[in-house]
Each structure stands twice: as structure tokens, then as C-alpha cells.
Amino acid sequence: GMMQRMTKHDHHAPNDDPAAAQPPFNPPMTGLITWLREGLRAGWLLTPRPTGQGPSAWQLLALAVLSTMVWTVLARLQVVGPASFDTQTWLASWWSLPALMWLAWWALPFVSLSTWLALALVAGVPVEVVTQGVAIADAHGVLPAAVLRNAWMAWGLYLIYWLWVWSVGVRLVHVLGASRRRTAGFGLGLAVLLGLSAWQFDTRVWAAERSG
């Protein structure tokens, strides 16, 4: 009778809530190729478009290894002839990463730090390829001698390098959602880190071996 209909209705009532019936939202994992592509976009001052979840621990490791290999190989090509690898200098070149990660964490309180790091690791590749490519060409005598032997030309290339690195870093935190105030703070901190790197740290990890 009526009691049975009410009991039947009440039995199904808890399942009428759409939110209760839906499984939790779990966006798909972003593939490694996507992180590489979008990181390179960021390196050319374009807007990255990652989709899905942040990177996995293994993806971050792969991105770090790949970007480091590019930088290390480019540095080796700048030295003509036999060269030795300076492990201590290579390790010291990573000194600024913890400070940079803290700055990004502060600037992006609502964005996963792993997302920023995945893009930032790859975003530095284009500027390294272009600027170190010029240095490699000079070291192997491809460029006219007057290009980098001229102090103004050398300082001009150096300035382009630092402005490019700084612009990529600032734009990346901005497009990921940092406020204007925090973007400005990140830019100031990044400028300080770049200045300290240029002033206090030798980043040449390959040294020409002396014959004899």
C-alpha cells in the first residue's frame, strides 16, 4: 500500500543526488611529449597549454635529465679538442634552483609547483640552443672573427641571453596565474639570482685539456 510506496521511494532517495552518483573528477595524466612541447612554447615566450594532471615524479626526472643533457652537450661543443668535465662546477651550477623554486612557490600559491618546474626545465632550452650555438660557431671559427671578439658584440649577446632568460621566467609565472604584485616580486628575485650567477659562479663545466 502507501507505506510500501513511501518505503520504496525513501530507499532510492539518497542516490538521487547527482554529486553522490558521479565518480570523483580525475583528469588524465599529461604525457611527456606534451610537457616537452609546452615547455618549448614557454621558452619562445608563447603561452603553454598543459592539460590534465601535473607531471609525475618520473616525468619530472626525465625532463630534468633531457634538459641537462642538452645544456651539457652544448657546453662541450664550445671547447675545441680534448676536454675534461668539472663535476664540482656542474653541481655548483644548480645552486639557484632551490631559491628559484621557492620564488615560484610564493608567486603561484594556487598552482602545483611540479607543473611550473616541468615547464621551466624545458623553457630554458631554446635560449641555450641559440646563444650557445653562437658561441659554438665562434669557437670553431664559423663566425667572422670580429663578431664576438668585439666587446660591444659580446656584451650585446650576453645581455640578450639574460633578458631572454628573465623574460621567459617572468612570463611563465604570469601565464600560470601569478598576480601582478607576485609576478613583479618573482621578476625582481630572478634578476638577483641571475646577477649573482654571473658575478660569483663559473658555469663552464668543460675545460680544455692541456697537451703534454
Model-derived segments and spans:
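Juxtamembrane "helix exit" motif at the C-terminal ends of alpha-helical transmembrane segments
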Residues: 69-82
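Alpha-helical transmembrane segments with an aromatic anchor "belt"
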Residues: 79-147, 156
